Amino acid sequence: MFGRLGAPEIILILVVIILLFGAKKLPDMARSLGKSARILKSEAKAMKSEAKADDAAPADPPNPEQSAAQRTIQAAPGDVTSSRPVTEPTDTTKR
């Protein structure tokens, strides 16, 4: 399908792209496309390394004492349930 594209067809496609997007926006679009490709490549590499790490990890059953400690939920700083009610501000200015 693409084997039949010659130089005139490619030039025509490039001219249409320049007319559609404008010459000023093309460098920014190419830069963002490059960043997206780089991010996609790094994410794919990270997924492969995670898969290799999961395969290399031993499949021992979890220790019951250890799993109970992992399930403990700690309160977040500024947790609403443990905070005191806010008092109304006193009016310090005189009218």
UniProtKB/Swiss-Prot annotation:
It is found in: Cell membrane. Residues 44-95 are annotated as: Disordered. The chain crosses the membrane at residues 1-21. GO terms for biological process: protein transport by the Tat complex. The Tat system comprises two distinct complexes: a TatABC complex, containing multiple copies of TatA, TatB and TatC subunits, and a separate TatA complex, containing only TatA subunits. Substrates initially bind to the TatABC complex, which probably triggers association of the separate TatA complex to form the active translocon. Belongs to the TatA/E family. This is Sec-independent protein translocase protein TatA. The gene is tatA.
